[in-house]
Amino acid sequence: MKLEELLAKASLKGIGRGIGLDVQMVDGYLQCTPLDPDDSRYSTDFILPSMKMVGDCRANDFDFFQPALAAGLLTEEQMHHAAERYHLGKTKSGRPIFWLIDDMLNPLDAHIAPDFWISTTLRTREPLLEYWQVRHCLFGLHLLTNSKLSAPVAIVENEQSAVILSELFPETIWMAYVSIPHLNTNLLAPLQGRTVTIYPRTDYTKSNYLFFLDYANHVRSLHSLNLHVDATLEHHATDSQKSSCIDILDFILQS
């Protein structure tokens, strides 16, 4: 029996209409299209990360700005500007949401500190995402879209620091790698042709700094970019600061 005949016999068209779908045969394949384009049952906006999802949780006031605001380094206007540029969001409980949006403006995932990811929730809610291969990019990568190739890029560990530093040093594009387990040599591939500086956290043993020296060597062997690892904290942080594993923003706030 031909597939067209099977389709008619099984009354799949009628079944489809009953659940809001138009069922058609196209080039030998079944094609199901929502009868109502606005039918939320078949909207992918709430299955995979989307700019609609990003927009629905947007916010512009965050507690992590308070040290910089209290020190007079930032104004509330700058806080709102940074929150808008980085598409920051908030959970219902008030925790900041840091979206990973690539250089094609595709939201890939979102990080909710300290160690929770939106992709985990989506997989729990939607069985269809069981085999979803989640990709990550640098936080702030979307800022390349409207930047010149000559604009320097700086990379820190956490998103809060990148957002605040972007207002302190606006001539630089600030990004974050979020955590070392997410680092791979291809993470920096979209930055080819640019001058990039990594600002590692310091620690008493210099292990983090040495790790990034090795990482930078691997990246340079694979991708064409002018990559440096900043040693400011290794040279100028106190023993106490190194024991606390401060980052470059902590150093600025404490200076």
Regions found by a protein language model. Give the residues of each.
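Cysteine protease catalytic domains with a Cys-His-Asp triad
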Residues: 65-71, 98, 107
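TOPRIM fold recognition
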Residues: 1-9, 147-151, 162-255
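Phosphate-handling DNA/RNA-contact segment within nucleic-acid enzymes
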Residues: 91-192
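N-terminal structured subdomain of primase-like DNA metabolism proteins
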Residues: 1-66, 72-93
